[in-house]
């Protein structure tokens, strides 16, 4: 019988890799919490309407969503991104009526796209969202928090910040019209996908990955020439705060985000070490989305980090870490000693709840078990053989210092472990 393999673009995370993921996720969670952000969790599956209403023309909705009918005949989709679901959850749970929540979440997203390095059909994001605040100061807080991630992970020198301001609705309409007029004169040089975007959402053309289109856009009008005064002052204040924080950045007037709901501030952190999949974090303001999804008008801003890409970047610089926190490796030689090891292990956890213990259940040779104990990274080995069982003691060996074995009563072992 043939074996069943994982679906294309869906990847397993091995136990060793999971340690690296846990290390990274813990770093991100700790920093988000240090800024006063609270965790929120919401479903992987939502009504398709949630995404079509918020991103009608985005490629994610038109080309990449996993959409199907449930047994009740309702159209549902695996979440392709987290912001719409987070907004829906905030509205549903009445989080926005009296509070201005600052939230974080992480988990898998799903897009049916061509798998490649740094891009999978199931991928993972760590995200932060802020509701009820519209100010350069909160935009700066999110950007500075993301900068702190890189400092903590040791990658600040290989990642750069780009920002733009998309202005108000009038700005975007005026600029879109000018962009369409410019590109219509280049129509023979436009591929089918660009021609489609020219009709549906011209600003999305700025996010093209085609070198030919990017070359054309070098002579296109700039949104800076259409920006409204309020947005201009808003951006100046934001840049002033970032300057005072000694944060390096580049204003990129071609920067847009891949989703349709963004306005005003947008930003990305990019690296040159991962080829075409260069964006590690992307975010921006979405001040109309809450209202579009059925809530009362509420400004908002957020960002998402692609965890697969971030792990690739850390590995590229040999910075990925994990903590093999194994304290005790139990070595046993008989079924009776296995039974005693299990009992001792439970007693140890009663006294030291956070101690990490692994029992070798294979009844292998002493040489084999000691090799596995060394390889496990454990700090110490506890040995139970017939001699130990008869004397009601446990043999203790420090695997770090390689000192001689000691024979200890359980009470003395506890004292030693607590010192």
Range-by-range predicted roles:
Residues 1-419:
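TRNA-recognition modules of translation machinery and tRNA-sensing kinases, especially anticodon-binding
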């Amino acid at each position: 019988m043939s074996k069943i393999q994982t679906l294309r673009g869906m990847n397993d995370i091995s136990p060793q890799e999971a340690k690296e993921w846990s290390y990274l996720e813990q770093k991100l969670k700790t920093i988000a919490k240090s800024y006063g952000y609270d965790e929120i969790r919401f479903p992987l599956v939502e009504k398709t309407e949630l995404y079509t209403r918020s991103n009608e023309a985005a490629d994610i909705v038109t080309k990449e969503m996993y959409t199907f009918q449930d047994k009740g005949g309702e159209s549902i989709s695996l979440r392709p991104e987290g912001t719409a679901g987070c907004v829906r959850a905030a509205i549903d749970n009445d989080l926005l009526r009296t509070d201005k929540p600052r939230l974080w979440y992480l988990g898998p997203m799903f897009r049916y796209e061509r798998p490649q390095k740094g891009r999978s059909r199931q991928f993972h994001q760590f995200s932060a969202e802020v509701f009820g605040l519209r100010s350069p100061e909160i935009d700066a807080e999110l950007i500075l928090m993301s900068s702190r991630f890189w400092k903590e992970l040791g990658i600040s020198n290989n990642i750069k910040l780009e920002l733009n301001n998309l202005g108000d609705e009038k700005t975007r309409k005026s600029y879109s019209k000018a962009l369409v007029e410019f590109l219509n004169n280049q129509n023979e040089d436009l591929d089918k996908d660009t021609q489609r975007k020219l009709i549906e959402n011209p600003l999305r053309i700025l996010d093209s990955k085609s070198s030919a289109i990017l070359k054309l856009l070098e002579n296109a009008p700039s949104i800076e020439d259409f920006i409204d005064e309020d947005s201009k002052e808003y951006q100046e204040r934001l840049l002033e705060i970032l300057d005072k924080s000694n944060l390096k950045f580049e204003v990129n007037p071609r920067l847009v985000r891949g989703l349709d709901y963004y306005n005003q501030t947008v930003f990305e952190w990019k690296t040159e070490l991962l080829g075409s999949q260069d964006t590690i974090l992307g975010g921006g303001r979405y001040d109309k989305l809450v209202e579009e999804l059925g809530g009362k008008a509420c400004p908002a801003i957020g960002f998402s980090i692609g965890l697969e890409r971030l792990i690739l970047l850390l590995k590229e610089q040999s910075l990925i870490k994990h903590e093999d926190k194994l304290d005790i490796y139990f070595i046993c030689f008989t079924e009776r000693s296995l039974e005693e090891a299990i009992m001792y292990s439970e007693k140890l956890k009663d006294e030291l709840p956070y101690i990490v213990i692994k029992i070798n259940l294979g009844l292998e040779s002493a040489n084999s078990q000691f090799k596995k104990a060394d390889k496990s990274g454990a700090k110490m080995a506890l040995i139970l053989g017939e001699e130990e069982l008869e004397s009601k003691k446990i043999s203790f060996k420090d695997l770090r210092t390689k000192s001689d074995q000691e024979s200890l009563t359980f009470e003395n072992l506890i004292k030693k472990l607590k010192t």
